[in-house]
């Protein structure tokens, strides 16, 4: 059994096979997921698992270098947006790296998921609680 925080087999495999600049989305329960993109569906019920809990595990398991968010996220769901920024800031401090943060329209965000290696669906029911992480390198 894996003694690290990430126990999901599909997510572990994804982390192990990511390359530099590959993108992975973590989304709320309602984001449309393109049929051609790998879906890792963690959603059990409304709010379980949460978006932030899933982000925390992802950041502990995978090196990132960039973040893409929908512009609408900060306006419509400011508490969840701020919680995400806190996690990103903590990861920057822990790694000594600075990540780019890009804001795009929600429509552009949905289109960008077509290029993701995978979309990880949570049970989150907060509007626009979605993020795309661009993979970095550990060296």
Swiss-Prot record:
Looking up InterPro entries in the UniProt record yields: D-ribose_pyranase, RbsD-like_sf, RbsD_FucU
- EC numbers on record: 5.4.99.62
Q: Which reaction does it catalyse?
A: beta-D-ribopyranose = beta-D-ribofuranose
Q: Where is it localised?
A: Cytoplasm
Key words, A-Z: Carbohydrate metabolism, Cytoplasm, Isomerase
A single MF term (Gene Ontology): intramolecular lyase activity
Question: Any idea which positions bind substrate?
Answer: 28, 106, 128-130
GO CC terms, sorted: cytosol
Q: Which family does it belong to?
A: Belongs to the RbsD / FucU family. RbsD subfamily.
Its quaternary structure? Homodecamer.
The name under which this protein is listed is: D-ribose pyranase
Q: What is the lineage of its organism?
A: Bacteria, Pseudomonadati, Pseudomonadota, Gammaproteobacteria, Alteromonadales
